[in-house]
Amino acid sequence: MNIAVRGIGIISALGNGAGETLAALRAGRSGIGKPTLFRSAVDVPVGEVRRDNRALGELLGIPARETPSRTALLGMIAAAQAVADAAIPAAARVALVSGTSVGGMDLTENFYRDFRSDNGRGRLRSVAGPDCA
């Protein structure tokens, strides 16, 4: 079997794109720090992409009302960068297959908070998809 990497994409606590990430690594910068976007029950340092989901969706042209999970957004951004880096034509049929351990956790926590206060509340559709199941 032959495998060829044609393009790369990354969005992380160090930056958005291979250029920003490489510059941060070369400068010896750390992406680890206190969380700024999410509350946590424990005080631990994290590697956080410091853009909220709305801003991530805007990078992809996704309307705020249709924003998928944070994990899906990050994967789609990196995939779009990789497709662009590989100079794959816009008309080409390209798919993103993503397997994660925390997909949809942000949506699940928001749903649970609303549902717990009133079991008639919460947007079930936002957590019923494969990203959150």
Regions from the language model: what does each represent?
Residues 1-133:
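Conserved "HGTGT" condensation-loop signature of ketosynthase/thiolase-family condensing enzymes
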